Amino acid sequence: MKVDLNADLGEGCVHDRALLRLVSSANIACGFHAGDAQTMLQSVRWALESNVAIGAHPGFADRENFGRSPRHLPSETLYAQVVYQVGALKALAEGEGGKLVHVKPHGALYNQAAKDPALADAIALAVRAVDPALILVGLANSESIRAGERHGLTTRQEVFADRAYQSDGSLVARGQPGALVESDEQAIRQTLTMVQKGQVQSLSGEWVKVQADSICLHGDGPHALDFAHRLRQAFSLQGIDVSSS
């Protein structure tokens, strides 16, 4: 059994380079919600150094709220913004002798696309326009995955180690009680259950089916590196390999 382990990079976290040694895929901020040309280039170089798959992490142009506030943009505007961000990172990766492998939207863009077919379509079309070989990463069982499949993209269904789930398979919104899984032990148990059994227990107690192709690790917490090490150890004990391919 194998699973992809991904982390967001280029968002100002101090653990980026060390975290890359523990994951198989990196989602690099593309300058709208965080980062700039220099951080994008540095993140690409670190990913190549660690032999980690390079992914674009486009978001809304909303630095003030770190791309986490909902926005309602015309489809054409969103399409252009995603093409712009993904295309820029693709050029930087190729300039360093690397390759852009996947695209994972950030924050509110990710969460809105998970529920909004029109928004999900705009993202999928933008990704396909840049390179139809790119993998689209989205919340398991979401509109993002369905849009990717509609438009002929390879998709990767993602689950979260440290986030709580609603009974419909969506994430509990940040700021709501219980949104974050605070205990490392609980987060590891939840992750193993999602990977091995294809299900997760929602905040209200129901079991929800999920397909865990990739697991997101958040690198911005105070114990991010320690948790990543512990999760890798748990995978090793269970015979689960970490790989982006």
Curated annotation (Swiss-Prot):
<comment type="function">
    <text>Catalyzes the cleavage of 5-oxoproline to form L-glutamate coupled to the hydrolysis of ATP to ADP and inorganic phosphate.</text>
</comment>
<dbReference type="GO" id="GO:0005975">
    <property type="term" value="P:carbohydrate metabolic process"/>
</dbReference>
<dbReference type="Pfam" id="PF03746">
    <property type="entry name" value="LamB_YcsF"/>
</dbReference>
<dbReference type="InterPro" id="IPR011330">
    <property type="entry name" value="Glyco_hydro/deAcase_b/a-brl"/>
</dbReference>
<comment type="similarity">
    <text>Belongs to the LamB/PxpA family.</text>
</comment>
<dbReference type="InterPro" id="IPR005501">
    <property type="entry name" value="LamB/YcsF/PxpA-like"/>
</dbReference>
<keyword id="KW-0378">Hydrolase</keyword>
<keyword id="KW-0067">ATP-binding</keyword>
<dbReference type="GO" id="GO:0017168">
    <property type="term" value="F:5-oxoprolinase (ATP-hydrolyzing) activity"/>
</dbReference>
<comment type="subunit">
    <text>Forms a complex composed of PxpA, PxpB and PxpC.</text>
</comment>
<keyword id="KW-0547">Nucleotide-binding</keyword>
<protein>
    <recommendedName>
        <fullName>5-oxoprolinase subunit A</fullName>
        <ecNumber>3.5.2.9</ecNumber>
    </recommendedName>
</protein>
<dbReference type="GO" id="GO:0005524">
    <property type="term" value="F:ATP binding"/>
</dbReference>
